């Protein structure tokens, strides 16, 4: 998905303020229109857009004796993803926007954020509080460490997305800048800031990141992917 398509979708979308409203009162036969109502005669939950809920409460104020509204976003352009479509392990607190691809057996940990247009390969783990920016492409059997940032490239639209090839480990709190390609079977050390392409089969570290060694048997042992964590 290119940046221009995403930008047009955001521009043209009807901005919404999704909300959940808890209501009490004489609710039997309450006409909620396009809003979703779940409840009984004297208590229920209304789910929908904030403005529509406000209008309903104003219209039915004599019947609704009490209410509380929880706002989930404000003028949001795009919804969150439907998590049921993924054959992956997605833990509570992960935030995944719509139009994200996630491969079978991937693991998305608590607090991870994945933006629109990103692609997560099969068996890849996105660890706690990692941020995967828009249009970033991450291959199969990778591990993106806790707090790592893979830069997104929706703005400016001409920017090239980050590409991380298969079997790559990105250490905790590392940063991969826009347009960088990380070659297969490589390691980005914790805290590194990657500003240039990483050759396949290498280990990079530092700020800015530089090649410090080749990927060898010792490195392979220390960065081994555990398949049991990816079983569904």
Curated annotation (Swiss-Prot):
GO biological process, one term: lysine biosynthetic process via diaminopimelate
Lineage: Bacteria, Thermotogati, Thermotogota, Thermotogae, Kosmotogales
EC number: 2.3.1.89
Record-linked CDD domains: LbH_THP_succinylT (cd03350)
Similarity remark: Belongs to the transferase hexapeptide repeat family. DapH subfamily.
Function: Catalyzes the transfer of an acetyl group from acetyl-CoA to tetrahydrodipicolinate.
Pathway: Amino-acid biosynthesis; L-lysine biosynthesis via DAP pathway; LL-2,6-diaminopimelate from (S)-tetrahydrodipicolinate (acetylase route): step 1/3
Enzyme class: transferase
Gene Ontology MF term list: tetrahydrodipicolinate N-acetyltransferase activity
Transmembrane domains' residue ranges: none
Protein name: 2,3,4,5-tetrahydropyridine-2,6-dicarboxylate N-acetyltransferase
Catalytically driven reaction(s): (S)-2,3,4,5-tetrahydrodipicolinate + acetyl-CoA + H2O = L-2-acetamido-6-oxoheptanedioate + CoA
NCBIfam families: DapD_Ac
Family matches, as InterPro entries: DapH, DapH_N, Hexapep, Hexapep_transf_CS, Trans_hexapeptide_repeat, Trimer_LpxA-like_sf
Gene transcribed to yield this protein: dapH
Record keywords, A-Z: Acyltransferase, Amino-acid biosynthesis, Diaminopimelate biosynthesis, Lysine biosynthesis, Repeat, Transferase
Organism this protein belongs to: Kosmotoga olearia (strain ATCC BAA-1733 / DSM 21960 / TBF 19.5.1)
Record PROSITE patterns: HEXAPEP_TRANSFERASES
